[in-house]
């Protein structure tokens, strides 16, 4: 997921670039090609210069926590994460206590309440979407993440929200800074047939678009604010509609993932499904 900036989805396989004096230099990753994101989260490495972890995992056996990063290829280090949870014994499950920001802005998603943490490992095995071996974070009722500090997603009334997810329930919030109907805040949600965007300003308002979401596959959803009053809604790179929104500068707030936000605690409109590695 990417918040703010001008990030775009890139298709195809990465190339390997050869240095002039021999050897290989790594192919540019998403944030190398499209820098400037206010925050970015993934189970895949998004920036070659990023040296931090992907996530912090709490294991169920003894509640110990540890940071896990990436392999040399930039994939999530599933082997180390699985071994950590197995060593803890018990149910051998793993839960996300922190999802690290790879943009360099250090605005991390976190959940300190163990009962609300999203699962990533079950019985010692990293969860996948069932069609390949790519890791996913499971989204379900009463579980969600929230940024550890405020973020301005639409600086100067321009910005992009990009997410890759699968929704298997009738309704759920992808991400939001929903504080109250009278504030300058927003909520992005989806059902198994629609994608919706709520822009709360001067009394509020919302728009839902029939997007024919395929619940059996992951969807790439993008919301691109190009001016004060125009918000473009895209599914898998195809524009669905330009929405007319209030010409307001959104407040810098904490962003909630998987539910809407009351204060700083995830609460309600839970997303049921999963987030993919990017």
Please tell me what each predicted stretch does.
Residues 49-61, 137, 174-175, 253-258:
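Short, hydrophobic/proline-enriched secondary-structure or compact coil segments at domain edges
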Residues 200-205, 251-277:
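Extracellular glycan-interaction patches encoded by glycine-rich segments
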Residues 156-159, 275:
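Extended extracellular/luminal ectodomain segments enriched in beta-structured repeat modules
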Residues 8, 224, 259-262:
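Low-complexity, glycine/proline-biased repetitive segments and flexible coils/loops
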Residues 2-5, 9-114, 273-277:
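GGW-centered surface loops in extracellular recognition modules
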Residues 73-85, 194-197, 217, 250-256:
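Short, surface-exposed linear segments at secondary-structure transitions and domain or protein termini
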Residues 43, 88-92, 97-143, 152-153, ...:
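Extracellular glycan-interaction surfaces
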Residues 57-69, 142-148, 181-187, 202-208, ...:
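Short, surface-exposed beta-strand/loop "edge" segments at domain boundaries and coil↔beta transitions
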């Amino acid at each position: 997921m990417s918040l703010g900036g001008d990030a775009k989805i890139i298709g195809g396989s990465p190339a390997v670039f050869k240095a002039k004096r021999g050897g290989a230099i790594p192919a540019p990753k998403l944030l190398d090609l499209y820098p400037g994101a206010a925050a970015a989260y993934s189970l895949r490495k998004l920036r070659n210069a990023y040296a931090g972890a992907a996530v912090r995992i709490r294991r169920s056996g003894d509640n110990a926590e540890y940071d896990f990063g990436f392999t040399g290829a930039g994939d999530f280090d599933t082997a180390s994460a699985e071994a950590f949870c197995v060593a803890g014994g018990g149910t051998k499950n793993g839960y996300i206590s922190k999802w690290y920001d790879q943009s360099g802005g250090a605005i991390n998603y976190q959940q300190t309440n163990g009962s609300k943490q999203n699962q990533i490992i079950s019985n010692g095995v990293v969860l996948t979407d069932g069609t390949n071996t790519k890791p996913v974070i499971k989204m379900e009722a009463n579980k969600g993440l929230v940024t550890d500090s405020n973020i301005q997603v639409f600086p100067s009334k321009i910005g992009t929200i990009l997410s890759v997810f699968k929704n298997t329930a009738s309704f759920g919030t992808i991400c939001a800074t929903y504080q109250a109907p009278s504030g300058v805040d927003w909520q992005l949600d989806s059902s198994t047939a629609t994608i919706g965007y709520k822009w709360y300003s001067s009394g509020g308002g919302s728009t839902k678009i029939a997007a024919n979401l395929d619940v059996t596959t992951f969807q790439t959803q993008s919301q691109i604010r190009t001016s004060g009053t125009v918000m473009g809604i895209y599914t898998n790179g195809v524009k669905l509609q330009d929405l007319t929104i209030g010409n307001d500068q959104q407040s810098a707030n904490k962003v909630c993932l998987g539910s809407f936000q009351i204060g700083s605690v995830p609460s309600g409109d839970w997303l049921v499904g999963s987030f993919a590695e990017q």
